[in-house]
Amino acid sequence: MTLRKNIIYRFFSIILLSKGVSDINVVSYGWEVFERNSDSRTLALAQSSIGYPIQNPGTILLNPALSLSHNNMIGLTHQSRMSGTSNSEFIGFDKYINDSSWVSVVMLYEGVDGIPDTRGALLDWGLDGIFGTFDVGEGNGSLDEGERLDVDKIRLFNQNIFGLYGAHSKIFNNWRIGFGLKVILHTIDKEFGIGAGLDIGAFRNYNNTGIGLIVKNLPSSGLIWESGNIEISPPSLHFGLHQKFSFSKYELEINPMFRGSILSLDKSIDSELVLGKIPVEFSAGFEAILKKKLFFRIGMFQRGTLASGIGLSWNDFIIDYTFLNDGFVNGIEKNHLLSVSVSIERLKKYFSNKIEEVK
């Protein structure tokens, strides 16, 4: 307990000291790892499942109130983009606090290798490419026609982002209220920054209709860099609707869903403007479940790009596949994602048997 108090005290001491000696910037970036990284099922539904009550590791990143019951599965997802230059990892599981309470945990990683640093590498010699002639473009600090970079002065560096998200929810006046605490460690070359943020979500199911609400970065999420600079991300509001249709004769479920987001600074070129100044975005998803074993999914992001996926479920093993072709959410190329969820009890049994074999 004393150690925990010391950590909290030091964290807030850094914040207070930094405010006195650094710049504070309100930015629209810094927490994208919690938006881009998820599991295959969530991304196949275009991240529109804010009001869809499913036991899925990535759902709590959309709405912490969807930590509805303890899920005895651990979910793993790997994604590689841009010919292996960018890689991301996703791990999600639930951890009991006591016999009747639990925390849903997600661990994230995203790394980009081999980023070129061209500072100081420009041969700023103008249009003719010859030093000292003082022709057009020479010495202006910009890469102009006829100029080039000195390859020997270009070096490569890496960027790494580690994220940790914990969600817990409780029933309050027929609504399930959830709190999501997120922590981030961001390194760029030799620089690093740490930050924390809070999301608050709500969910209610009424006659097979799910309603979800979440405020992200409340009151704001902060990232403190080693240099002392502080980057603050303002809050945004997201809401979702889901409707369940059951056809018991065919053992079939149909689940359409919708998401709307009212943004602040984190808008994109595809955002719609309400009243000419309020950026909003929409996405939609659809999932069909046959005999609770076979899943078919399709989703549409704000920019109109389609996502699709399938899934197979057994008692203690789930596999999901998703195909994405969305430059805004997941890079500039087509992406294939594969997620695997395995029962923790099955893993314990497997490793116990291996240990016994070694003995």
What are these regions (language model features)?
Residues 1-2, 123:
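Low-complexity, intrinsically disordered short segments enriched for Gly/Pro and polybasic residues
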Residues 4-14:
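Sec-dependent signal peptide recognition
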Residues 23-359:
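Subset of outer-membrane beta-barrel
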Residues 12-22:
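Hydrophobic h-region of N-terminal signal peptides that target proteins for export
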Residues 3-4, 35:
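A general structural signal for short secondary-structure junctions and capping/turn motifs
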